[in-house]
Amino acid sequence: MAMAITAKMVAELRAKTDAPMMECKKALTEAEGDFEKAEELLRVKLGSKAGKAASRVTAEGVVTLARDGDDVALVEINCETDFVTKNDSFLAFANAVAEGVVKNNPADLAALGAMPLAMDSFGPTVEDVRRGLIGKIGENMTVRRFKRFASGKAASYLHGTRIGVVVEFEGDEAAAKDVAMHVAAMKPVALSSADVPAELVAKERSVAAAKAAEDASVAQAAGKPVQSAEIVAKRIEGGVQKYLKEVSLNNQTFVKNDKQTVEQMLKEKATVIKSFTLYIVGEGIEKKVDDFAAEVAAQVAAAKGA
């Protein structure tokens, strides 16, 4: 029996992809309710727009940085609503955690929670303060992830409280800071094409192949000539190579000068980027979508039964 596709499911997929409602319903029906498969089907039918929109995240929180000499800490702390991200106690907690990470070098989240901290009459550990603030503010909050950099030169950039970047480098500090800003703006996934994770390359190749097959089917139905297998293969490979250039830092067009790539700019500045780390608030976290209509209906039903 085919899975029933509800209006709520269609609305959730549309919110993630920006695709038309009817296309979302068709994709969910074809995917038998599988959201990930439906997203890929939309990418095949609608191109990269759906894929780009699907990368947007909605979970709340802050990303913050702390420095101690040459050492740097990058931390993400999540909460339930945007309102709390502006709360003074929450922000002070986030900054205190980052400072604790850069000074204490905890091995993992458990060790981070055990670090000494006292604030707002809570303590004596980070975990005690976290629990205390949950009670005080009335929202759940978690320390999601952190990274400490202590291997040498590190440039950093914060875009508000939602995006943080740390770049480890050798050479010119100003150039490295420009790269950190570039990473925040362009969001590469790897230093070079060769460093792009194999699973991402395979997924992109699969999408390109499915798009080519879809186009061939449309052409055949319209009585138009279908491209040869050789041309299709070149087209798929061309799409993959284009993707690799778009997501690898060295190959991206430099955000401050569209006449050169990041790699060309770095060569001019005699600078080498050893690694970069990008934190985006809520990246990969699904935010709960409230069904207000269902909630109101439930309240009405409860009132009638009272």
UniProtKB/Swiss-Prot annotation:
**Assigned keywords, A-Z:** Cytoplasm, Elongation factor, Protein biosynthesis
Tell me the InterPro entries matching this sequence: EF-Ts_dimer_sf, Transl_elong_EFTs/EF1B, Transl_elong_EFTs/EF1B_dimer, Transl_elong_Ts_CS, UBA-like_sf
Record's subcellular location: Cytoplasm
User: What SUPFAM superfamilies does UniProt report for this protein, alphabetically?
Assistant: Elongation factor Ts (EF-Ts), dimerisation domain, UBA-like
> Which GO MF terms does the UniProt record name?
translation elongation factor activity
Would I find Protein biosynthesis among this entry's keywords?
yes
Entry annotated with the keyword Protein biosynthesis: yes
Gene Ontology CC, one term: cytoplasm
Involved in Mg(2+) ion dislocation from EF-Tu: annotated segments: 81-84
Offer one Pfam family short name for this entry: EF_TS
Of which family is this protein a member? Belongs to the EF-Ts family.
- What is the stated purpose of this protein? Associates with the EF-Tu.GDP complex and induces the exchange of GDP to GTP. It remains bound to the aminoacyl-tRNA.EF-Tu.GTP complex up to the GTP hydrolysis stage on the ribosome.
Q: What is this protein called?
A: Elongation factor Ts
Species of provenance: Polaromonas naphthalenivorans (strain CJ2)
| Upper classification of the organism | Bacteria, Pseudomonadati, Pseudomonadota, Betaproteobacteria, Burkholderiales
Gene from which this protein is expressed: tsf
